[in-house]
A protein has these predicted regions:
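Sequence-specific dsDNA recognition surfaces
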Residues: 7-55
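Non-catalytic DNA-recognition/assembly elements of restriction-modification systems
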Residues: 1-17, 130-146, 150-182
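A short beta-sheet element
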Residues: 50, 58-103
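Short aromatic/basic micro-patch
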Residues: 25, 60, 122
Length: 182
């Protein structure tokens, strides 16, 4: 395991949208605090976004970093200028592991500490790239990424089960109340 800086293993992507196609459109409102997967976006083309991103890249909400908004993109699209697009240097870090480096309390604490501005603090890539963390070799990265994504899948399945149970209870309660009133 070796200590590395984020900028040694990942880079900020500054790609401009070419205007072709019907991209997914991501604003800060689509990044859910604590969620590592981007699950919603817009297709409304009435916006001024020009920053392009691609499937597998990490979208980091650089404005108000204390909100802990960062997620891996499941599709290609365009995003707000208040989102930093981060891509793994694949010979240094597995793209599947990078989202977990970004979506963690230590990284967010670092980002908040480097943010500037009072009403709407923002953090720059020039500061984020200096974030240091321990990184294992590629074989261990593969094992770790696999394990972490299994945890994410299990957590999401559990949350879905809770939601379905809530809906079932609501439907039973509604049925009993309306059925009993007739």
């Amino acid at each position: 395991m070796s200590k590395v800086k984020l900028g040694d293993v990942a880079e900020e992507v500054k790609e401009t949208y070419d205007g072709k196609g019907n991209p997914a459109i991501v604003g800060l409102e689509h990044l859910v605090p604590g969620d590592i997967r981007l699950k919603s976006w817009s297709t409304d083309t009435d916006n001024t976004f020009t920053k392009a991103f691609h499937k597998g890249q990490v979208l980091f909400g650089r404005r108000r970093a204390y909100l802990k908004k960062a997620a891996v993109a499941p599709v290609d699209g365009i995003c707000s200028g208040d989102i930093t697009v981060i891509s793994a240097k694949q010979d240094k870090i597995l793209p599947e592991l990078l989202p977990f480096v970004i979506q963690n309390d230590d990284f967010f604490d670092y980002a908040v500490g480097k943010s500037a501005g009072s009403l709407s603090p923002r953090v720059k890539w020039s500061h984020l790239k200096e974030y240091e963390f321990n990184l294992p070799g590629m074989d261990q990265q593969r094992q770790l990424a696999n394990l972490l994504w299994h945890f994410v899948d299990a957590k999401e399945a559990y949350e879905d089960l809770i939601h379905q149970t809530d809906e079932l209870v609501k439907s039973q309660f509604t049925g009993n109340v309306t059925g009993g009133a007739a």
